[in-house]
């Protein structure tokens, strides 16, 4: 059984993330979507809220499970004996950062490999930050995130969606 880990903050999960997860689930026997507790980032949503949104968004993909971690990704990989990291690339600018991360992970855990999946063209502009900014002003985020996530965003910002 070949497993892969797809790490991220998922603050919140977007349809771009889900696209990468669905495609990864067709390649690997199991995908572990790993919510990072990154001390350098101040998330909008709590860990519990992010896990809840992922559970709702990924419930129809049978070979996906969700977990969370704090610390080095490679320590988590060793602990569960997984050697594959999936990362999505939206643009060339993503590659430079992701390549550096992949090399660092390889240095710390020589057995691990990072597999890059190129985003679907319709999601190349999409990021959690973009979605949060649009939602904070009540802008329409339909098609950018699952409906459940959109509800949670508008609720968090205390706004009603415009033009939906």
Swiss-Prot record:
An example GO biological process term is:
coenzyme A biosynthetic process
As cofactor, the record names:
Mg(2+)
Could you tell me which pathway this protein works in? Cofactor biosynthesis; coenzyme A biosynthesis; CoA from (R)-pantothenate: step 4/5
State its Enzyme Commission number(s): 2.7.7.3
Q: Which domain of life is it from?
A: Bacteria
Record's keyword annotation contains Magnesium: yes
The residues that hold substrate are: 9, 41, 73, 87
Gene Ontology cellular component list: cytoplasm
Q: Which UniProt keywords apply?
A: ATP-binding, Coenzyme A biosynthesis, Cytoplasm, Magnesium, Nucleotide-binding, Nucleotidyltransferase, Transferase
Cellular localisation: Cytoplasm
Write out the catalysed reaction: (R)-4'-phosphopantetheine + ATP + H(+) = 3'-dephospho-CoA + diphosphate
**Residue positions binding ATP:** 9-10, 17, 88-90, 98, 123-129
Per the annotation, which location comes first and is thus the protein's main one? Answer: cytoplasm
Q: How does it assemble?
A: Homohexamer.
**Task performed by this protein:** Reversibly transfers an adenylyl group from ATP to 4'-phosphopantetheine, yielding dephospho-CoA (dPCoA) and pyrophosphate.
Would you identify the family this protein belongs to, as annotated? Answer: Belongs to the bacterial CoaD family.
PANTHER family to which the protein is assigned, alphabetical: PHOSPHOPANTETHEINE ADENYLYLTRANSFERASE (PTHR21342:SF1)
What's the protein name?
Phosphopantetheine adenylyltransferase
Give the species this sequence originates from: Dictyoglomus thermophilum (strain ATCC 35947 / DSM 3960 / H-6-12)
The root-end lineage is: Bacteria, Pseudomonadati, Dictyoglomota, Dictyoglomia, Dictyoglomales
């Amino acid at each position: 059984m070949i497993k892969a880990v797809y790490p991220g903050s998922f603050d919140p999960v977007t349809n771009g993330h889900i696209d990468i997860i669905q495609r990864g689930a067709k390649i690997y026997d199991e995908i572990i979507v790993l919510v990072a507790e990154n001390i350098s980032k101040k998330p909008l949503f709590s860990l519990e809220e992010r896990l809840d949104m992922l559970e709702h968004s990924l419930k129809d993909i049978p070979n996906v499970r969700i977990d969370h971690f704090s610390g080095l990704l490679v320590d988590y990989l060793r602990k569960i004996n997984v050697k594959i990291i999936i990362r999505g690339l939206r643009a060339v600018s993503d590659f430079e950062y992701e390549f550096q991360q992949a090399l660092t992970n390889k240095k710390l855990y020589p057995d691990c490999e990072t597999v890059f999946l190129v985003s679907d063209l319709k999601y190349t502009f999409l990021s959690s930050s973009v979605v949060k900014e649009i939602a904070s002003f009540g802008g329409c985020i339909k098609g950018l995130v699952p409906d459940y996530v959109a509800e949670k965003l508008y609720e968090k910002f205390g706004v009603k969606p415009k033009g939906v």
